[in-house]
């Protein structure tokens, strides 16, 4: 395989993995631990 093809595929896989992990963190079971700082702040 060409080095440019391998690099392109590697970068694409990394972007998809980071996006998937972000969606899992935002909407999956770990989202129960997330806190909204605007709800915590009182004037």
Swiss-Prot record:
GO BP term (any one): photosynthesis
Keywords, comma-separated and alphabetical: Membrane, Thylakoid, Transmembrane, Transmembrane helix
Residue ranges of the TM segments: 7-27
Location within or outside the cell: Cellular thylakoid membrane
Domain of life (superkingdom): Bacteria
Assigned GO CC terms: plasma membrane-derived thylakoid membrane
Membrane topology label: Single-pass membrane protein
Chief location category: membrane
Family in the record: Belongs to the PsbN family.
Function noted in UniProt: May play a role in photosystem I and II biogenesis.
Identification of the protein by name: Protein PsbN
Organism: Trichodesmium erythraeum (strain IMS101)
